[in-house]
């Protein structure tokens, strides 16, 4: 039986129902929505190439957004579901800004849809029952080439697929990587509006879903 967790977003944000176990129909529907948006904002050829780089339709459709149970986002299909919500939040946060401070919807959607794609490759199911039961590790880390962060890997995948970024889009693609960086204080604390919108949307995802 599917497990529902419903939440209401402040400031008249939309309501979403996140399931810890998604039916096949929901998985397919979410993937279809994600792919359609990806084609809209990066182009059909680029979108197809990205999905292929990530392992194909099934890999993206079934991918998790996180690895531990306490995040509330470590389940099959959470990647597309969460990224769709992230895109909506980011656009609505932008709408709350004074008009002269707002950034383009196209750039917001592009970055929101692409900035986490590295996670599709990053996680694989945890096969250690003890770690699953005692540590809540539903997924573990896959062995990937290069010691690079999610945002950096996402940029690499997108650019290898023909996607081009403006300076502000490139910065925003890495904004969540910067949270744990101490050396690059300037770029961490003096980021553009697009980066701040994406950062706030990511923080909303965490607050809404994290188990306390």
Model-derived features with residue positions:
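Divalent metal-dependent catalytic cores for phosphoryl transfer on phosphate-bearing substrates
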Residues: 67-81, 88-89, 93-99, 103-211
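Non-catalytic interface/linker regions that flank or bridge core catalytic/transmembrane domains
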Residues: 7-8, 16-67
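All-alpha helical catalytic cores of prenyl diphosphate-utilizing isoprenoid enzymes
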Residues: 50-59, 74-84
């Amino acid at each position: 039986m599917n497990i529902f967790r419903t939440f209401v977003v402040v400031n008249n944000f939309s309501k979403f129902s996140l399931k810890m176990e998604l039916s096949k129909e929901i998985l397919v529907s979410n993937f279809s929505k994600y792919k359609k948006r990806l084609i809209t904002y990066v182009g059909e050829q680029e979108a197809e190439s990205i999905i292929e780089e990530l392992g194909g339709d099934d890999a993206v459709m079934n991918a998790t957004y996180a690895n531990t149970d306490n995040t509330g986002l470590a389940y099959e299909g959470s990647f597309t579901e969460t990224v769709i919500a992230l895109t909506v939040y980011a656009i609505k946060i932008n709408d709350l800004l004074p008009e002269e401070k707002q950034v383009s919807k196209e750039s917001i959607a592009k970055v929101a849809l692409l900035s986490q794609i590295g996670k599709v490759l990053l996680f694989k199911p945890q096969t250690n029952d003890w770690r699953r039961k005692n540590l809540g590790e539903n997924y573990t880390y896959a062995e990937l080439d290069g010691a690079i962060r999610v945002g950096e890997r996402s940029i690499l995948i997108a650019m290898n697929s023909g996607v081009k970024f403006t300076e502000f889009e490139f910065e925003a693609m890495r904004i969540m990587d910067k949270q744990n960086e101490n050396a690059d204080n300037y770029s961490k604390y003096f980021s553009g509006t697009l980066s701040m919108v994406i950062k706030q949307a990511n923080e909303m995802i965490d607050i809404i879903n994290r188990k306390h």
